[in-house]
Amino acid sequence: MDFLGNGYMRNKSIKFLEFAGEVGNMIGARRIVTHIGPYNGISSKDAIDRLVPIFQQMRNHYLEKGYTSQICFELAGKHDLFGSIREITELCRRVKGTAPCINWPHLHARGNRWLNDRESFKRVFDYLQASLGLTKFYTHFSGVEFDIEGNERHYSPIKKGEIKFEYLAEVILENGYNVLTISDSPLMEHDAMYMKLITERVQSRRMERIARREASEKIKESRKAAAEAK
């Protein structure tokens, strides 16, 4: 996609998204996800100013056609592509009815490999809630590999990547976030099941901790009651 390109490339991208909306409507797709493409030499601010009317018209086109699919803008991992989390959030804020697609490996690469603990994932959810008031989140997950200069090269299986899905699962479960996570891994189905397994393990450990804490509190209350009875 190249929504910031010359007239031909921009119009071609618009036609692709119109067609995606038509097909998505036929199959009952809930979301139509798109990248924006390269900056083509313009600033981030100018890019957003150009994109807003394009996607306002596209949103209106979907509504006029009766399409129920939501347009989602996916984060980009490379710095020459439009798609930082702040850019995508601002675009969604200005084009009502659209939403971000949080691609975790792209975000990790774009942010100089910073998704390395639970708190870093939590900050993303906090930012999206504060900026857009989101209560539902649509995300993509996989491993990611880098070239010798530290630039994003390609997706990898989750076990070979440096982003730990356990951290994401813990943050989702502990905060009760409503999150749909899609596997972008080269081992798509395998890693989808792997993420499900990790989530179940995290939830099991979480419930065990809660049970132990509740049992400990009951013991304390029982001992306190016994002491008072004396």
Task: Give the residues covered by each predicted segment.
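Short acidic/polar active-site loop segments enriched in Thr and Asp
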Residues: R30, F137, N178-V179
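Generic structural signal for hydrophobic
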Residues: G24, L91-C92, L128, I172, ...
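Active-site acidic/histidine proton-transfer and metal-coordination neighborhood
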Residues: D2-C101
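N-terminal small/glycine-rich loop or linker at the start of catalytic domains
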Residues: M1-L4, I148-E152
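A short, acidic, amphipathic alpha-helical segment used as a generic capping/interface helix at domain edges
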Residues: F121-S131, K159-E174
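Acidic/histidine-rich catalytic cores of soluble enzymes
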Residues: Q57-N151
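Glycine-rich phosphate-binding "P-loop"
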Residues: G150-E162
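C-terminal accessory extensions appended to soluble enzyme cores
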Residues: A169-K230
